[in-house]
Amino acid sequence: STLARINEQQPAALYQQLFHKLLKYYEHSKVAHKFRFKNPLYSLDASHIDLSLSLCEWAKVHDSKASMKLSIGLNHSNDIPEFVAVENGKENDMVQGRKFQFPAGSIVVFDKGYVDYQWYANLTAQNIGFVTRFRPKSVYQVIQQHPVLESKGILKDETIQLNSAHALKRKAPVLRRIEYRDQQSGKHFSFL
């Protein structure tokens, strides 16, 4: 409680300077992982945070609800968020997702909330790879089938073209679709 009272009296600029010093220090640190990628690996995700409407009227999204959305682009080489945005809780994940600038040659992993075929085309044009879950009702055509390693759980490896009217209008790029079976749970997953 004594420390809390002392901290309460410090100027906000002190904490801002401390944050930037810590960030600079940790930006150049590397985290050891069990996996290795030659390309920079990023995770992109957004979290919906419920707030008290009586305390945070500025975050009102409905008559009785307040919330905000926190979007983060995490660099896995040092486990530090390189991109952070806080927005209105009603905002679609893609609004901030499109704004993040990933370096060419990197790989970005994101969930199904980031479905935007034009964005996929832009990432591909910038030489940025991505991995996301494949929507099961997606309309596509198989262009080519590749050899698979069933012993590793890979059931299908296909080059596909999304060919729904929506995907064609937004110039969805040619994509790679991987179907995988988790050996422990037996569950099937499809990825782009």
Spans of features found by a protein language model:
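Long amphipathic alpha-helical segments
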Residues: 1-3
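Single, function-defining residue in the core of a domain
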Residues: 5-21, 33-54, 63-192
